[in-house]
């Protein structure tokens, strides 16, 4: 059984390496792919929502596909800010469709991070996220146990993608991870999409602040529940 599992991991690992090699070849040899990746990285580096909007919109009928690919790109390169894409989607496609696009694409990105970590192991993940960041994510899993994914998804200041990578290094089942991710990120996606499509200036930050307050309240409640459960087990 263990041998079969190990063999399957190696098959997945080889597949990922082949895909990565194919992407590098496409970036080097295909002008369209080269331009897309370079423009994507430049838009993120500028931390400019309007710049990302213009970039997505420039692809016309393929704008939604480009937005989806951008979310996948930022998931793999964890330091890139996903909220810029969420705001851009809301502005371009409206609160509902933009929010749905952001939610589904971020779910796909989270699943990819989980899969990469599970197949490639800690050494590769540390190179993608940084050892310090990954160690801090380990601390969340130690503190919150099985509730970690849901708790961290509700906290807007906890990095989204490193948690996905860290989860892939644990024994958590993919199904549990995926459900907790979907539920946990839904409130933030709704608020950011609504705020991004309708609000500006001080009102936007007021609504965002309310969401952060709500998220902290939920996390405090869950932390208390987890603490009480541990007290009962230790009694």
From Swiss-Prot:
Membrane topology label: Multi-pass membrane protein
Main localization, broad class: membrane
Localization, UniProt: Cell inner membrane
Coiled coil: none
Membrane side Periplasmic: residue ranges: 1-13, 86-95, 198-202
Spans within the Cytoplasmic topological domain: 35-64, 117-176, 224-235
Pfam family, one: VTT_dom
Alphabetized InterPro entries for the sequence: TMEM64, VTT_dom
The entry's keywords: Cell inner membrane, Cell membrane, Membrane, Transmembrane, Transmembrane helix
Segments for region (VTT domain): 90-199
GO cellular-component term (any): plasma membrane
Transmembrane regions: 14-34, 65-85, 96-116, 177-197, 203-223
Family of this protein: Belongs to the TVP38/TMEM64 family.
Entry text on domains: The VTT domain was previously called the SNARE-assoc domain. As there is no evidence that this domain associates with SNARE proteins, it was renamed as VMP1, TMEM41, and TVP38 (VTT) domain.
Protein known as: TVP38/TMEM64 family inner membrane protein YdjZ
Gene: ydjZ
């Amino acid at each position: 059984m263990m041998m079969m599992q190990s063999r399957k991991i190696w098959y997945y690992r080889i597949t990922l390496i082949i895909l990565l090699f194919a992407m590098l070849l496409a970036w080097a040899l295909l002008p369209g792919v080269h331009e897309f990746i370079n423009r994507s990285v430049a838009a993120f580096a500028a931390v400019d929502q309007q710049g990302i909007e213009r970039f997505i919109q420039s692809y016309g009928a393929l704008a939604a596909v480009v937005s989806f690919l951008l979310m996948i790109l930022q998931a793999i390169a964890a330091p890139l800010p996903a909220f810029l894409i969420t705001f851009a989607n809301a502005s371009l496609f409206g609160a509902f469709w933009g929010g749905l696009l952001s939610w589904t694409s971020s779910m796909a990105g989270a699943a990819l991070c989980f899969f990469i970590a599970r197949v490639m192991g800690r050494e590769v993940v540390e190179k993608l996220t940084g050892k310090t960041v990954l160690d801090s994510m380990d601390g969340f899993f130690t503190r919150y146990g099985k509730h970690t994914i849901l708790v961290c998804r509700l906290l807007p200041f906890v990095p989204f993608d490193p948690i996905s990578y860290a989860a892939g290094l644990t024994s958590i089942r993919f199904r549990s991870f995926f459900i907790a991710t979907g539920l946990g990120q839904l409130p933030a996606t709704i608020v950011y999409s609504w705020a991004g499509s309708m609000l500006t200036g001080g009102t936007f930050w007021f609504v965002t602040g309310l969401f952060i307050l709500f998220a902290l309240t939920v996390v405090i409640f869950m932390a208390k529940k987890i603490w009480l459960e541990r007290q009962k087990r230790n009694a």
